[in-house]
Amino acid sequence: MKNDQIVFEKTKNIAHDINQMQNQQEIIDYLFRQDSLTLNQLKHYYSEPSLPLQFLVKVAVLCMFISMTLASFLFIQAKEVFTNTILSDISPAVFSIFTVICIFMTYTKIIKKGNKNKGKASLNQRSEFYEKNKLINTILYKKYKMDQQNIQANKHTASDNEDSMNFSAVLNHVLTISKNDKELLGYLDTRDNAMLSQLKAYFSTRPFSLPHYMSLMFCGSIIVVYATSLFSGQINYIDIPHIFIFLLLIIFLKILIDLIKLLNISRKGQLHTVLHFAQRAEYLRMRGVIDFILTERYNKKIM
């Protein structure tokens, strides 16, 4: 995690320096002086989704727990929370109406807007990131092309013994020589298309499957329902002290503060996941080299 933080801060500072440059040629010259690892770290920095999955899961969990506390206070524990008889009698009905309104507003918002993102600031930032990524891709292609041309004419070719190497052996060798672009390019160029495709699949991001997400949300919902029943005193065989109401209030305030912090962070621009940042950038570089080799091969066949 410490290394990821260091790499992320370095990449963030480089991106900040690039933003200060007004001339595109100055940006091109600056990027061309960077090595491929730094360029791929920048590319990964600009390529991350505006709302990473970890952020969405965290928000979903926080929202479930804040719903739990609201339901416990205003619906189930209303008579114990509010000493005023009028408030304790009216709060369950008000909470029920509030819940129905929230459901209706959410449904109408989804119907009207769908998945469209019309935010002008978000559009400008995404277009800027697309432009930076295209520039980085062009520079990387140029660098790989130069490395390919500099590889000796009598370059190493795959022998029969190497052809029999399984995927694990090839992968281990690739990870060993991954820091040297020229050596990596020369070695991968001796592999066939099937092996390169397997390597690219390995270095690609594992998709977060729908069943996995559903299982997490299902387990989270069960925990929230159980906690709501427990804190509200609905489980007869477990005696809950009165102090748990104050504990529930503390949980509510803590979650509310966390949600406000997340909203403020999201308004500042694109969110980034620091965890495994260095590894994800390195895997992106591997995929870039493989894409370059495959593209060159296919271009020769098409021409």
Curated annotation (Swiss-Prot):
Entry keyword set: Cell membrane, Membrane, Transmembrane, Transmembrane helix
Entry annotated with the keyword ATP-binding: no
Compartment(s): Cell membrane
Parts forming coiled coils: none
Keyword Cell membrane: yes
Membrane topology: Multi-pass membrane protein
GO cellular component, one term: plasma membrane
Membrane-spanning residues: 55-77, 92-111, 208-230, 240-257
The protein, known as: Uncharacterized protein YbfF
Organism: Bacillus subtilis (strain 168)
